[in-house]
Amino acid sequence: LLENIKKVSINVKNLNEFLDKKVFEIEKHDGENRIGQVNGLAWTSVGGDVLKVEAIKIKGKGELTLTGSLGDVMKESARIAFSVIKVLIDEGKIKIPKKMILDPKTNVYDSYNLHIHVPDGATPKDGPSAGITMSTAIASVFSDKKVRSDVAMTGEIDLAGNVLPIGGLKEKLIAAYKADIKIALIPKKNYERDLKDIPDEVKDNMKIIGVKDFDEVLKYALV
């Protein structure tokens, strides 16, 4: 049997042939502000990542469509986000352009269907930490305001609009730094508790802001 064993030489050039892993790269943001497109921060098995969240509105009856291989918890977060934005619209905190009002007797969010998508659809995604990211995408769509491309965020949101703490902060902020993000919005509790664990290189080159509610998120995210 030993005679049939062949020697294999592994070096830098052929290493990828023996690794069953994709090369993990984080793209830098392109500098273009867009309506309904937000940079979220995610934790993965190979480190942090910048997760794009997209939202569009289509004339309809207030239905919500979710795509991108989202898990149950993330779908729940999207529904919570939509409810939070509805409340903010009703309270007048999110201003709706006149051109978007199809029927003055109908709530604007009942005149459109909303579609939220998280690209890289073949990759399963789950967890509550994209709550403020999805909320920002929806707010952008209904206010017709663009989202800053140099801002990224992570945080769970509840029905009262409070921003709740998340896990994997160190990895997420390192990913934001690699993507050339200038402002990272994180839950205030994480800011107070976990900022000491973040590398100085990240803290020195990126503004990290702790937010306690969604009103603060909008102040930094929309232009």
Positions of the model-derived regions?
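Peripheral, non-AAA+ core regions of ATP-driven protein-machinery
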Residues: 4-16, 21-39, 45-223
